[in-house]
Design a protein with these regions (language model features):
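N-terminal accessory targeting/assembly segments
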Residues: 1-195, 206, 578-586
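Long, charge-dense accessory insertions within large macromolecular proteins
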Residues: 162-211, 216-223, 287, 301-304, ...
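N-terminal pre-Walker A segment at the start of P-loop NTPase domains
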Residues: 207-252, 283, 287, 295-311, ...
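Glycine-rich phosphate-binding P-loop
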Residues: 249-283
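Flexible beta-alpha connector loops of hexameric P-loop NTPases
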Residues: 309, 319-340, 372-387
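Conserved alpha-helical scaffold flanking the Walker A/P-loop in AAA+ ATPase domains
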Residues: 338-350
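Conserved P-loop NTPase nucleotide-binding/switch module
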Residues: 350-394, 398-399, 411-439
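Conserved NTP phosphate-binding and transfer environment spanning the P-loop NTPase/kinase superfamily
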Residues: 399-402, 408-586
């Protein structure tokens, strides 16, 4: 049974002025009017990570309409919206400094422009819950009981009142938010049957505010996207949207077809901007982002060169033949892969773990991996060049493995011969130039010779060995942390994710680290292939939710701040673990 709010106040008054560890006496549950406060974890000192609390409001108090959380997509969208409302309420409150270190801090794990499944809020049939981090007030390392009373008995009930009760929420904004996310996911569900890998809606704003901001460029500076007629498709909407001419039940825009799509155009005309939008389009976006009508197949993977990365037992023989000194590439391992070998490994690993499409930009690719022209062929004979360029494998990837490619290429017309669709960007506006590109290829045929002598065979599966995963550090049995969106600390290992470009939230990266530990401890049995292991992780997320990711999770306690990554990013992180050991399964 929870204690009363009066009990909490009395305890805080009693420990006022005592050492900081006295705050441990408030761990537990406290019943307020229409609210239960759970104090799950108390920080060790004012400078440590904030304490973990939960605010739970019963259904009859929250009174959120059930249709807003009917089904997994709507529930995820509503939970994301509630966390954003909580963050807004915290920002709008008078900033109050309540002592040393993190004293007085209130934090919720609200996201950016993407809408993700996260643990910061939970909407159940019986209650609504917000997970909060709070810096408990202190002077030096002494408890400030009165300030803590104002925070826990005043600020937090006020936060719950404004973030979890329907009567105080912006109701139309909530409905529009949920509807927008559901529309995006409905479009995504139709892409495959329509023969598409992505959709870019008419009117979308693709450019971002700056290199340091993911917010949209101001409307008066941006060019709204407009589909070429030959590529325009139409999708019905689950929820009508308001437009200048009233409500509409369909959305139109450019369909990016399966196969090989080439995006060409001059510099600064929007090629890479389009590709980046497709890269982020694997997630739904908030209303008003400009990319809420950019929807990509969930399994599209951005590929790039990655000098210096770790590669373990990957068969890159389709792209790289035997290296000097007779070094085989059918089970390639390296602690310091080159640009070309890393890009080859990135492609093979992505396909191995379920990618249905690849996104590549010439700007971040290894030139010698992408193409070898006739003059270079004449100077450096094939017997001295182990690389079979991507140009000669891109069609086989689609025809043999059903893996599509969207490639930004402004400097090499040799790709005209292998492209199914050519999109030319002019001042941020696309037009389809497939026929023109084919005519140019016919008039001016490439003089380069095809050098691939063997077909692109099957992808060699690999079995990860659990003994190579050690999450311990010092006396800690499990020490996992995410120091940045591109860095996981896993035991004594640092996993560099700078080139895994589809992670968009620090809480995703944190979840990736714990998902690796989950996979190694529960799903790696020496027989399961990496793709099977990753699928088991995805199935675990679906069945148990992200709450259970934390190895120290205790029942209903605050699980930490997690946002759901794709299995593809979990696999990418596993592949970059420096201690990783794999066994090929042929």
């Amino acid at each position: 049974m929870p204690q009363s709010a009066d009990d909490l106040q009395l305890t805080l008054q009693r420990i006022d002025g005592r050492g900081y560890k006295a705050y441990r006496e408030i761990r537990g549950a406290f019943a307020f009017e229409g609210l239960t406060l759970y104090v799950d974890h108390v920080q060790g000192d004012p400078f440590a990570a904030p304490s973990k609390l939960r605010l739970r409001v019963p259904r009859e108090t929250a009174r959120i309409p059930p249709e807003l959380f009917a089904g997994a997509v709507r529930r995820m969208a509503l939970e994301d919206f509630l966390v954003r409302q909580a963050a807004r309420a915290i920002r709008s409150a008078e900033p109050t400094r309540r002592g040393s270190g993190k004293s007085g801090t209130l934090l919720v794990d609200a996201g950016g422009q993407e809408v993700l499944e996260r643990t910061a809020a939970v909407v159940s049939e019986d209650w609504v819950e917000l997970r909060v981090q709070a810096g408990l007030p202190a002077a030096g390392r002494r408890v400030l009981g009165r300030q803590a009373e104002a925070m826990l008995c005043g600020d937090l009930p006020h936060l719950a009142e404004h973030a979890l009760r329907w009567e105080n929420l912006p109701q139309q904004e909530a409905r529009d938010f949920v509807a927008c996310v559901e529309n995006q996911e409905q479009i995504r569900a139709q892409l495959d049957e329509r023969g598409l890998v992505a959709f870019v809606g008419d009117g979308a704003i693709l450019p971002r505010e700056s290199g340091a901001s993911d917010r949209p460029l101001r409307a008066n500076e941006a060019v709204a996207f407009r589909s070429p007629e030959s590529l325009r498709v139409e999708f019905p909407l689950a929820n009508p949207v308001e437009g200048p001419d009233g409500a509409r039940n369909v959305v139109t825009g450019m369909g990016v077809r399966k196969g090989v799509t080439l995006v060409v155009g001059g510099g600064y005309h929007g090629k890479s901007t389009l590709l980046r939008a497709l890269e982020r389009g694997v997630y739904p976006h908030v209303p008003g982002d400009g990319r809420e009508w950019v929807v990509s197949d969930r399994s599209l993977v951005k590929i790039r060169a990655e000098d210096g990365r770790r590669v373990e037992q990957v068969d890159i023989g389709a792209f790289i033949g035997d290296l000097p000194q007779g070094r085989s590439t059918t089970a390639f391992s390296s602690d310091d892969a080159s640009g070309s070998t890393s890009q080859a490994a990135n492609i093979v690993e992505a396909v191995e773990t379920g990618a249905t499409g690849l996104l590549l930009d010439e700007d971040t690719s290894a030139t010698n991996f992408m193409v070898r022209d006739a003059r270079m062929q004449a100077l450096v004979h094939k017997e001295h060049e182990p690389i079979t360029p991507f140009l000669e494998r891109v069609r086989e990837l689609y025809e043999r493995h059903s893996v599509s490619t969207v490639l930004v290429m402004g400097g090499c017309g040799d790709y005209f011969e292998v492209a199914d669709t050519v999109i030319r960007m002019r001042e941020f506006v696309p037009d389809e130039s497939t026929q023109e590109a084919r005519e140019i290829a016919t008039r001016s045929p490439s003089e380069r010779r095809v050098e691939a002598t063997t077909p692109f065979g099957s992808i060699t599966a690999r079995v990860p060995l659990a003994k190579s995963f050690d999450p311990s550090r010092g006396r800690r049995e499990v020490k996992i942390d995410a120091r940045a969106i591109d860095l996981v600390l896993f035991g004594n290992d640092a996993i560099d994710l700078r080139c895994v470009e589809q992670l968009v939230d620090l809480s995703q990266t944190r979840a990736v680290g714990h998902a690796i530990h989950l996979a190694a401890s529960r799903f790696m049995d020496g027989k399961a292939m990496l793709r099977e292991v990753v699928q088991r992780v995805e199935d675990f997320f679906d069945a148990e939710g992200l709450d259970a990711l934390d190895p120290f999770h205790r029942g209903s306690h605050h699980p930490g701040n997690f946002a759901r990554p794709r299995g593809l990013e979990v696999a990418a992180a596993i592949n970059r673990l420096r201690s990783l050991r794999m066994r090929q399964k042929r």
